Amino acid sequence: MAHKRSSGAGRNGRDSNPKYLGVKRGENAFVRAGTIIIRQRGTKIHPGQNVGMGRDFTLYALIDGKVHFETRNNRKYVSVYAE
């Protein structure tokens, strides 16, 4: 066993807390107004119809309905359509 830690080993051993990002409600999922659909960093996916965006880029439903993902002009959008 080494009596001294190897060079740099004492400076390792940290990790950041989990951020729980990603899609929270998938395609065709029924959501109520205010339900978080996606948590993200930046506009990886843009808000479509009946979807709002929080200041941390969280996308959430503005109405009750079904979630629908679509691509337009090389951009991904998520929309909520009423039943």
Swiss-Prot record:
Region named Disordered: 1-21
PROSITE patterns: RIBOSOMAL_L27 (PS00831)
Signal peptide (residue range): none
One GO location term (cellular component): cytosolic large ribosomal subunit
GO BP of this protein: translation
Keywords, sorted A to Z: Ribonucleoprotein, Ribosomal protein
A Pfam entry, by short name: Ribosomal_L27
GO molecular function: structural constituent of ribosome
Family: Belongs to the bacterial ribosomal protein bL27 family.
HAMAP family: Ribosomal_bL27
Name of this protein: Large ribosomal subunit protein bL27
The organism of origin for this protein: Kosmotoga olearia (strain ATCC BAA-1733 / DSM 21960 / TBF 19.5.1)
